[in-house]
Structures are given as C-alpha cells and as structure tokens.
C-alpha cells in the first residue's frame, strides 16, 4: 500500500514459471520451492553482531529469528501442527521478513511481488535533505518522527552534525 514502484507478480508470469529463478526462492524462508528450502542451514540470515545492535523496541528485530528461535512474525504459525521453526529447520538469525505467496507457508508458488521503492524512502530523503541543507534539528525531528511511528518508538538521533546524520 505504500509502494511507489514495484513489480507485481502473478502465478502465470514467466519469472514464476521458471520455478526458482526469482525473488522469493532466494529470500523467503518459508517457500516450498526455493534455494533455501530443504538445504541444511541454507537460509538467508543476519550477522549476529548486527542483530545485537538492533534495539529490542525496533520492529526490525522481529525480521530475524532471535538466538532462541523466536520472532513475533511467526511464533504462532504452524504447518500440520508443527511450528514453522521446526518444520523448516530454522536456526537463529534466519530472515522472517519475506513471507510466502498468499501467506501459505510451504507452498511452491513463488509469485510474491517485488517492492522496489516505498513512500517511506521519501521521508528519509526529506530528513537527510533538511540536515544537509543546514537544518540539522529539522532533519533530526523528521527522522525521529518517522522512525518512532514506523520502526522504533524509543528512537533518538544521536547526530551532532549533518555529516553524522548521513
């Protein structure tokens, strides 16, 4: 709903008909037909050091499994009575952000749309333009309002200069 630019994919598109030569087969941890499915520890992950830098209050922390294999995005999801983590053999730090087609875990249709640019990017560009244009406090305010609303309610910019802000 906030996309400015994207590629809308349907099951009959060539990119889907090829099977695994597409976005979901590379990045979706929950597809039944992809580079990540069935390959021991073949899932896309975040580095543990980077994961540890994400504040607990930031929704982006839930885009990856925690060290104890938890993510609010999939904690209650199951296939045939088995947890998603167990069913797919997921391990800590695995990406949970990109869902399966039609939110059906384990399906083999890789027809997920591809977001290329979202409206949110314009807010970030505006914040940076304010800061780089000599209004650091305005840029920080724009950024803080955006991040607090959409990502992390406790976020505060620590930038002391326009260069720090970048």
Language-model regions: role of each:
Residues 46-47:
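Periplasmic/extracellular electron-transfer cofactor-ligation site
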Residues 10-43:
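His/Glu-based metal-binding/catalytic segments typifying zinc-dependent metallopeptidases
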